Each structure stands twice: as structure tokens, then as C-alpha cells.
């Protein structure tokens, strides 16, 4: 599953990053802020840690797995904080260009303001759920190993929406509605669920806990999506 998740991230972000880098070189968009690079390095490090931890368990090096896993207690908070800093940074980049940029930039970016305000919903949702699910996983690491290993993957699946939404060749409901992103995230975890179900002949508690939190949160995002009150709330949150 770790390899599968890394593949999703690469397929989503590499072409998008190459396109935007070319735009920066052509002067068609602002340079990437340093905060974006920091977040990318932290997320990449987390995914590689997840892969390494999976390989350690698969090769019966559990004592090393436990020692290396301590890194998550540093990496996860750093990743969450970086995300909380990055979201308003990218928001202000678009909002500032739409309101104070050159006329051509204002014309191009103004239609993106409502979109970026809606995307802020997804970013907040992903950040909160990732932190909650990782917290559940780490709390269960000693007493409930089955919950721990599954919840680590289920937590990691939540921010995959950022990569999936960049796969413009996929059928999508965006930007009108976020429901397609949720469907693709469910599909991303489905191989693990099916394998688990076939092997153990039951639905593990980790999936029940995850769905009990994930689905209401997704419904709340869908409810707030593109509502006038949400747009005004987003602008107040961002201080504009």
C-alpha cells in the first residue's frame, strides 16, 4: 500500500509541478514559496518512512520498526504545522494577484478566488483528519497493532486528495462539488480493504472507526461547499 500511495502522489504531482515550473520560468505565475518546498519534503519523507516501516514489519524486523517509528512523533507534527502555514500562503498568493496584480493577472485569477476558498475547505478537512487518524494510530501502536498498521495507511489516504485532484484526466466533480475526491480516496484504500476482507473474513474495526469520522466530515465539507456563508468565512479566516 505504501508503494501504491507513493505512485498516486507521483502521478498527481510530478506532471503538475513540471507544468507550473515551466510557467514560473515563462513569467506566467509567481515562483513557488519556500513553504511549499518544505511541505513537499516533509510529505515525501513521511511517505518514505511509511514505506520503510512497512518493509521492516514484512521482513520481521519489528524491534527496528519500533525504534525508527519514533521519527513519526517529530515528522507528523512538523507536517501538520507546515500544512497549516502553506494553506494561507497559497490562498494569499491567488487572492493578492486577483486583487492587486497586473490587469492581466487580475483577469486570470479573479475567477479562481471562489475556487481557492472552496479548496481551503478540503485543506482544513485533510489536515484535521490526518492529525486525528495518525493520533489514533500512534496511540494504538503498543496495545492494538492491527489498528495501528491499518490506521497509518487510512490516515495517509486522506491527504492523497491533493494529488488526485491534480490528475485532470480523471473524471471529476471539481470544482462544482468535492464528492469525486472522496470517491477516489475510498478507491485508493479499497485494495487494502478487499485484501483484509478476503484474508480475515471480517471488517476490521479500523475501517469502521475511519468511516465513522471520515464520512461525516466529507458530508460537512459538501454541505459548506460554495455556500456564500462559507466564502465570507474563508475570507475572515484568511484575514482579507
Briefly describe each language-model feature range.
Residues 1-240:
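Alpha-helical membrane insertion/targeting regions
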